[in-house]
Amino acid sequence: MRSIDIHDHVKGRSIYLDDIPLIQGTLFARVFTSNVAHGRIIKLDISKARDLEGVHKVLISSDITGINQIGGIIDDEPLMAENIVDFIGMPIALVLADSESIARKACKLIDCKIEAFEEITDPRIAYEKGALIIPSKKFILGDTESTWSSCSHIFEGKADINGQEHLYIETQGAYAQPVEGGKIKVYSSTQGPTAVQRAVAKVTGMEMHSIEVDVTRIGGGFGGKEDQANAWAALCALGTHITGRPVKYSLSREEDIYMTGKRHPYSADFKIGFDNKLKILAYEVTFFQNAGAAADLSPAVLERTLFHCTNAYFIPNVIAI
């Protein structure tokens, strides 16, 4: 099947976020982020950054005009840190400046001290400590307990699957523009424009019908530009809502890699039983999903894990947790 877009792609005619002509007066955004995985902010001084020539605003969580929350399934993901930081790369302050270079320079002038807390990066440890993001779910089919005695062969073990960077060619980004009547138009490189619209409405305090989200092209997504695209659109829209000027933020590759979520690492304990013809009779598995600092779409991914865990086989007796 031929792609209807292929000719525009190979001839360079496809319009991506960075190909959109800039409106005069556009401000460029950069975020100052946490260098600690988990901790409390004990000092935050933005005065030097704010006073730098070419800087128009330095926004922190208290400047948010709506709700400091972009969580999709669960409201557990602040757009900017208030007192607690939850991951390395968590936005603490948003700089709006005349150029990207000035915005970067301003970020280096922000003085922040963070008291580090214990960090939990292993979901098995989180389970032991009762620190799961959501309660465990269970999928049951048949009766495994009464089936083990009928199995000629039983294998038990542990499997580990590493995470994965989506590594889309076009990095995350957004471009917000003011529209007459106090409305905002947001260009976003997203797989979920409605999710972006909802997040922008939360953060700005605006009605959803006052926010238009436009997607020109997505330079690759692979699941990495679903809810992960929301933060950058919300930050740009917040900047536009407060300043009345267009705001653009295109993440560098370095920023994208350390500030955005990945495909989940998994660890699993399994027990599987076969009859003497090697037909699978029973299967028990406990999955430990590393969801990172916030739920994002992890609950839905976990449900798919449970429903798909038997793969192409029909196994009459299953317990999946």
Q: Model-found features: residue ranges?
A:
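Flexible hinge/switch segments at interdomain interfaces of large molecular machines
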Residues: 16-27, 167-172, 317-321
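Beta-strand segments within the central parallel beta-sheet cores of soluble alpha/beta enzyme folds
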Residues: 60-61, 210-216, 244-254, 281-286, ...
